[in-house]
Amino acid sequence: MESAEIRRRWLSFFEERGHTAVPSASLIADDPTLLLVPAGMVPFKPYFLGEVKPPAPRVTSVQKCVRTPDIEEVGKTTRHGTFFQMCGNFSFGDYFKEGAIQLAWEALTNSVEDGGYGLDPEKLWITVYLDDDEAEQIWRDKIGVPAERIQRLGKKDNFWSMGVPGPCGPCSEINYDRGPEFGVEGGPAVNDERYVEIWNLVFMQYERGAGDGKEDFPILGDLPSKNIDTGLGLERLAMILQGVQNMYETDTLRVVMDKATELTGVRYGAENSTDVSLRVVADHIRTSVMLIGDGVTPGNEGRGYVLRRIMRRAIRNMRLLGATGTVVKDLIDVVIDTMGQQYPELITDRKRIETVALAEEAAFLKALKGGTNILETAVTETKAAGGQVLAGDKAFLLHDTWGFPIDLTLEMAAEQGLSVDEDGFRRLMQEQRDKAKADARAKKTGHADLSAYREVADTAGATEFTGYASLAGESTIVGLLVDGVPSPAATEGDEVEVVLDRTPFYAEGGGQLADTGRIRLDTGAVIEVRDVQKPVPGVHVHKGVVQVGEVTVGAPVFASIDATRRRAIARAHSATHLTHQALRDALGPTAAQAGSENSPGRFRFDFGSPAAVPGTVLTDVEQRINEVLSRELDVQAEVMSIDEAKKQGAIAEFGEKYGERVRVVTIGDFSKELCGGTHVGNTAQLGLVKLLGESSIGSGVRRIEALVGVDAYNFLAKEHTVVAQLQELVKGRPEELPEKIAGMLGKLKDAEKEIEKFRAEKVLAAAAGLVESAKDVRGTALVTGQVPDGTSADDLRKLVLDVRGRIQGGRPAVVALFTTANGRPLTVIATNEAARERGLKAGDLVRTAAKTLGGGGGGKPDVAQGGGTNPAAIGDAVAAVERLVTETA
């Protein structure tokens, strides 16, 4: 049974049993704690946690997953892979243990004719959690599994949790006995190579507390509702159903290995080392295609680094196998042709995937050539000196100059019997990051060379900041730069950077935006200040434009800030402190500040959190903040020693470095933080705070965006107007709106389903007419045509196969149908066995048609799919297919 059929059969089986089929989510995880989706349940986490209402009580999916922790083991074992498809069925408070177990048993053991996978029940072994008497009783008494094929295991093997406090529960695994050639008897507790796990049923019924590892945590109690989360590895089931030794020999990976052997001349099975490389190539190329297809591009951080690492390992292993030229395009085309049957978007997005992959291949081949020479020289020098450790600076050079990921250097060094000074490498990497941050901060002033600012600091001393007490004041120009170059004077229209001996202007820092305003000279000259930065400690650089007159160093000036803007920013900054404290009160000290920006009338606050903050918690936080405003608490600032500040429990601000004396901002009895920013005098001055929402900005970091003061009021006023309009439209009170709108959307969805059903029936009804239209081309029945626009790929495929099946007499048959979906042409072509014996293969025909359509395609000899960009060329594509059939038949 092909992988595509396993996938189709899974979804069909559970849909027939009341489950709503949900498409695979993107591999890019919508979860700050994850770079990529590693399990089928990840897209459903909000439902299990009660944060979002599930789309249905029963759901099924086949989820794309990527896991890379064991990447070094890929190819060396027959079970490790970076990409896999997780088939899952989920229940949110609906059926529980007995229902999940019954469904799993039926799916695996029902005959193929009855929609199951037809596994031999005698080869299935069950594991249950040590104390789960209920699950064992169901397996034994309800299903009929003999007691000797049911084994109890501990928390490590048969108890599931997310690794943090939250839902958890015992699980039951279904294992398949592959026979004595894979090891000794004794069940999965003894030999997991012979008794391979294929399906895990998780019974989420408890809430766990904090703890370490898979076993050391307490059970706090029962969950309000009991849920089911199951996962079956599609590749593992394919291995069994296709009767192969390991997952690399299944249909979707073997074709990639076959292409790699074709490109290198190496035979699979000849020797272990080349087999490992072939398996690495097959796995990594497939993973690369799936990642690029979901929008990941190679890079040096996060998901991009995962992709780059995987692609470069694949390319290098092709080199180890003897490949000399570019190989990536040939390999990814095989993956797209194969996986495109299950994920048609890969076929339509082929060009972009190829472009991204080929660019990375070109970059790495260039890097590999130069970097390998450097590495070989370094290895030779190290060995000649009697060393066994490659220096960290060599690894850094390879990374910085040639783009070698550290794990590639580790791997290549190990092949030469050397280890690598990883600590030294990481130290140099950190030094580079620190330098980059310093340069970025300097460039923010418009001039990366800090010498001019240091010279001003050396001659004139630090700028005295007077902005805490006053919004304007007299000063003197002690430094002047025009277009980044020191100058004694500047004239009207010049872009300038001005340094004063004292200033009321706040320089950007601590998350607070800089003040803006004007600097006036006695001569009438005016500088409009647009930004203020501190490129070196103690020096305020005022960036702006000379609007009128001439400005000279040494001239007396009067500096004044935009007071309205300053007050709006101060409100935002004080609101940020209140939000920080309210979040810590709600979530605990882990909700530490990770960044902020305070601008006029609005602010954003970044904080640590392993998961999204529930909407109810955000509502409570907002209410708490506004309660504090109504208490009219005084806001006070005091300078004290850092030790005294710590004793008082003051919270340090993210990203700031502090000296021995620090400024502490205290808001009544509610908040106390180290802060150099400007604030209101009393919380009543904030007026109102409105949290707009919360989102992820990275792994383990969330962001709240909010409005304060008049901006918050204006937002609520607009919302009130919208609510009033909705009331008028649906004829209901505000509290009735969600239910009424949900009902309307439900009716709309039902109507769309009916339309879709009618359209599908109409398409299939055309089958008889299409059969009658068949042409005889040199003894081959050829059916071509264009079906109504908007026909889905699945419906088009069903129609093509239906028409092919109706052609009688055992004569050769080719069916090629076309449609337009979302403005793009789509074709599915099928051939029967008699046609294939004449050399008429669906994949060849599709490639011919798709080329005419301005795209690409592929598939199996019996059925293939393609698409393009030019729907006007469908007639030409039909003609091209007819010509090829005529020439071949």
UniProtKB/Swiss-Prot annotation:
Recorded GO CC terms: cytosol
CC cofactor: Zn(2+)
Subcellular localization, as worded in the UniProt entry: Cytoplasm
Residues annotated as signal peptide: none
Residues that, per the record, bind Zn(2+): 573, 577, 675, 679
Reaction(s) catalysed (UniProt annotation): tRNA(Ala) + L-alanine + ATP = L-alanyl-tRNA(Ala) + AMP + diphosphate
GO MF annotations, alphabetized: alanine-tRNA ligase activity; aminoacyl-tRNA deacylase activity; ATP binding; tRNA binding; zinc ion binding
Listed InterPro entries: aa-tRNA-synth_II/BPL/LPL (IPR045864), Ala-tRNA-lgiase_IIc (IPR002318), Ala-tRNA-ligase_IIc_anticod-bd (IPR018162), Ala-tRNA-synth_IIc_core (IPR018165), Ala-tRNA-synth_IIc_N (IPR018164), Ala-tRNA_ligase (IPR050058), Ala_tRNA_ligase_euk/bac (IPR023033), DHHA1_dom (IPR003156)
Function: Catalyzes the attachment of alanine to tRNA(Ala) in a two-step reaction: alanine is first activated by ATP to form Ala-AMP and then transferred to the acceptor end of tRNA(Ala). Also edits incorrectly charged Ser-tRNA(Ala) and Gly-tRNA(Ala) via its editing domain.
PANTHER family: ALANINE--TRNA LIGASE, CYTOPLASMIC (PTHR11777:SF9), ALANYL-TRNA SYNTHETASE (PTHR11777)
Family membership noted in the UniProt record: Belongs to the class-II aminoacyl-tRNA synthetase family.
HAMAP family to which the protein is assigned, alphabetical: Ala_tRNA_synth_B
Annotated protein name in UniProt: Alanine--tRNA ligase
Organism encoding this protein: Streptomyces griseus subsp. griseus (strain JCM 4626 / CBS 651.72 / NBRC 13350 / KCC S-0626 / ISP 5235)
